[in-house]
Each structure stands twice: as C-alpha cells, then as structure tokens.
Amino acid sequence: MIPLIGQLYRNNNVVTSIHGRGLINRSVIAIMKAHRFARHRMADDAELSVHETFPILKAMSELKLGAASVDLGKMVAKFKAEGNGRSIEDFVKAELAEVAGKQNGDAREGTDVVLYGFGRIGRLLARILIEKTGGGDGLRLRAIVVRKGAENDLVKRASLLRRDSVHGPFDGTITIDEENNTLTANGNLIQVIYSNDPASIDYTQYGIKNALLVDNTGKWRDAEGLGQHLKCPGIDRVVLTAPGKGALKNIVHGINHTDIGADDKIISAASCTTNAIVPVLKAVNDQYGIVNGHVETVHSYTNDQNLIDNFHKGSRRGRSAPLNMVITKTGAATAAAKALPVLKGKLTGNAIRVPTPNVSMAILNLNLEKATTREEINEYLRQMAMHSDLQKQIDFVSSQEVVSTDFVGSRHAGVVDAEATICNDNRVVLYVWYDNEFGYSCQVVRVMEDMAGVNPPAFPR
C-alpha cells in the first residue's frame, strides 16, 4: 500500500485517509492502526481490513486522477452499501469520475506562504505545511520572519524545528545554509528573514509573490496593525493565529469558513479553545437547541506564563505555571458567538491553567431546549464525528482509560469524551479534549487552504 499511497500523493496530489486518519508518510504500523481504529467508525463495529482498502487504492492508481482527497474507509463502506454487484474497479471509476483522467489537468502554481513568527504555533504550522507539500500546487512554505536573537540564530531556529519536547522529532531532514540564511526541510527551501518592522520587507526579492502571510506573534490583532503586512511587496493576504479585534472575521473552519470572501485580505483563525468548542456547540444546538450554558476550560500552561513567580500584567498569571492551577479569563465563550451568532448572549466562560505543557479540556455545561439521554447524545455526537461535515473538527472517544497525553498530535479541533458525558433531561455536561497546539494548527491550515483556494474535492461524496 505504501508505494501506491506515495505515488498518488506525489504524482496526482491525491491525499488518502481512513475515516479522517491520514495515510501520507505513515509507517506500516501506523497504517495498520488506522485500519483497526476504523472499527469505531463502522456501524457493526467490524474491523477494516487491508484486503478491503488495497483493491480500492489499486483501482485509484490506474485512473490518472487529478487532485483529490479520498477516504478509503468511507469508500469501503459505500461500496458495501451501494456496490450493487459492480466490480471494485467500476465502483471506484464511477465514484471518482469527477477527477478521473485529470492528472495535471488543473495545474496550479500553488500559493506562497510566509510565517511571521516562529514560536510554538509557527513551528507546528511549518511541520504541517512541509508535510503537505505534495506536488507543489497547494500551500508552499517559502519564508519565515523572525527577530535575530543571537549570532547562531539560524542554527537554533533549525534545532527547535527539528526537536520538540511535546510533539517529538521532525519527520525528515533539515539542512542549514548560514551564508544565505536558508533552511532546507525535506527538500523545501525556506528563506529565513530577519526583521523588526513588518512593513519594511520586500518579499519579492526572495522570489515570493501573492503570498499568504500568517502572523503568529499576536502582537497585532486588528486590521490596522495587521494591515502593515499588506504594504510589503509580495504579500497578498494575512491570517492571524489569535482572536481578532474590531471588524475582523473570526473563522472557525467547518463552521463559518464559507464566509471567507475574495475581497477578505485579513482574517483571524480565532483561538484554540474557540475552535475546540464551537463545532460541538453547533452540533448540539442543531439537534437539541441550546438555551444557555457555561464553558470551563482546563488549559495547559503557555509561554505567556512564568516558570517561577514573577511580575505579570494579568491577574494570577505571574505565579509559577508548573506549580499552580491558575484561575484566569477566557474570551472563548464570547468569541464563539462571533463564529456562531445563534449563541450570542447564551454562554459564559472561565479558564483554569494547569501544570501540563499541552492538551486542554473544555467542559460544556449546557441547558437544552429538548430533553435527551446520555446514550442518545453520545450516539449523536459519534455520528457527527463519522458522517457529517464536521468530521474533521469533531472526534469521538469512548474509553475509561484515556488521559490528556493520549491526545497529543490530534488533528481534530476537539475530541468528545463519551465516558465522561453527564445528562439529566434538559441538562448536559460534555467533556471535550483538544490539542491546543497541533489540533489548532491543523485548523489554521484548513483556513489557509480555503483562503488560498487550494482545497481539493473530497470523496466519496
């Protein structure tokens, strides 16, 4: 399977997955685990076999496909339900007719990407973008902008990309060219630009044009501040990886990404917590109606806090992060209404920072218009994770043994913990895990792909 998966990706820009679990650059063991995971997504809890997915993959390889995203697990399920005696080859050809024979038929230049800032989110975005390079007609990481911190700054930046205490080693190779201030990661040449002024850089001198710039610094959060980037030659659009202020659109992919217009030059990808809770809130509101509720986030500490007690402009934030639980504020409840206006005025929110470096939890305490049961709402959310437009945002787990570190590297915006669900008629309490670093970064990339118009069609329909 691995050679076919790789060939389809490199030659056809076809991304394969099994019920949302990506197969690109995965080991044999990881692919087998993805097949076994599928039992949580099958109606009869049956395990998915490579003997079922491989024939579909082989048939795909013979169709000269154009760019597409194909879920092999769902293809198997649809073939079982709607095959009607057809051969695998005929079924796959009919299902993928829209892109069959279109290899290189929609040749695009791709979209240049500049990361302005290279902290926790910036480095994870870099990893994801490098991983998704494919044939080069999607998002292409071209440059990173930072302030120079030391004489050996480039070496240190490369080391931080190569090694991560939470997310593990970089999957590939990184070489350094100090003379030209470039990094080469898995064959991708990345220019490192040193600057303290966002409006002073001419990106075109590095061959960058019509680029999408991602501001990871959080220093500017309104249109005026972020508009400085648009004054630079080579920059066409800007995405902020923090809640936006003023009239900026706060986009949560899967919820309101269709609001992104061709004229939108600056948008916000909201916060990690907003991305985690809004998809689940929308699912619940659509089915049961939300009267009101409270959102409590149990959030890992961040770089904004102190290792030991020291001054901080925020209340309690100056106290030692590794030693304390810290009650603080969150704007997620208010921000949720920006992405989902039907929730305006219905939610309150608060946060507790805890001594863990990554993975957080949102506790949604909701009063519903329609009464339900624990079993019913869990099954509904399970179905939403499997067969809805929110399947990339909502994941679902039903185990009494999972803990926070089990969700490091989750690519979903949030994961509903079914075993923790509490329900009493019209009142429900839902527990949603989320990787506040990597899961959020995946959401940011989805917003970037929509803004750049490089999202391939997804199959099966």
UniProtKB/Swiss-Prot annotation:
GO molecular function, one term: NAD binding
Cysteine pairs bridged by disulfides in the record: none
Protein EC: 1.2.1.-
Single biological process term from Gene Ontology: glucose metabolic process
Keyword set, alphabetical order: NAD, Oxidoreductase, Phosphoprotein
Keyword Acyltransferase part of the UniProt annotation: no
Location of Phosphothreonine modifications: 421
Protein family according to the UniProt entry: Belongs to the glyceraldehyde-3-phosphate dehydrogenase family.
PANTHER family, A to Z: GLYCERALDEHYDE 3-PHOSPHATE DEHYDROGENASE NAD(P) BINDING DOMAIN-CONTAINING PROTEIN, GLYCERALDEHYDE-3-PHOSPHATE DEHYDROGENASE
Protein's recorded name: Glyceraldehyde-3-phosphate dehydrogenase-like protein
